[in-house]
Amino acid sequence: MRFRIEHLIEAPLARVESAVLAPGALIELARRAPLIAEARELARREEGTAVERVGYLCAKAKLPMASRVIEGGQLAWNERIVFDRATHRARFTIEPALRPEWRSRFVCEGSYVLTETSKGTLRTIEGDLAIRAPIVGPAIERAVIHRIADVFEAEAEILRERCRG
């Protein structure tokens, strides 16, 4: 299932980009996003104009009914993003903490683009989510995309605040 999320941040692109890539951004997301219980940066590597960041995020809600699929019933995932400062674009993948036999049934990847406009910086996130589960897959995809949008909305609010000050 394809998704697209846009946010306008009323600040220059360079300021928004710095806020997006700032160390500690994931920790702040855990404090502010209602759905996130924990978030931390696992790895960060900068080379030339590229910044690669791997983050760990864990949802507040447990899903005991999904313990067959999700490790410990706790919805958690790693987010890998490779951002190119020269093009203001990134590629991301989301790797959920699923039992090994279920990992190939979940795919989420996409792009993250910052574009300067006359009103500020437009942040566009486009992605594809596929959950290969008979009958319920599309319904789960819609629910997950809704949650992804909620997390990106919380992140947009954090970016707006960071860019104001």
Label every model-predicted segment.
Residues D84-A86, G137-G165:
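A conserved amphipathic terminal alpha-helix motif
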Residues R31-A33, A97, E141, R164:
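Sparse recognition of residues in long alpha-helices and their boundaries
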Residues I9-A11, R85-T87, E116-S118:
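A generic beta-sheet turn/junction motif
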Residues M1, G73-L75, F106:
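Residue-level preference for beta-strand/loop junctions
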Residues L42-E46, V107, V151-E155:
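Alpha-helix boundary/capping detector
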Residues V51-R53, W77-V82, R91-H146:
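Beta-strand/loop substructures that line and gate deep hydrophobic ligand-binding cavities in soluble
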Residues R40-P96:
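Glycine-rich portal/gate segments that line the openings of hydrophobic small-molecule binding cavities
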Residues M1-M65:
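Hydrophobic ligand-binding cavity/cleft-lining segments
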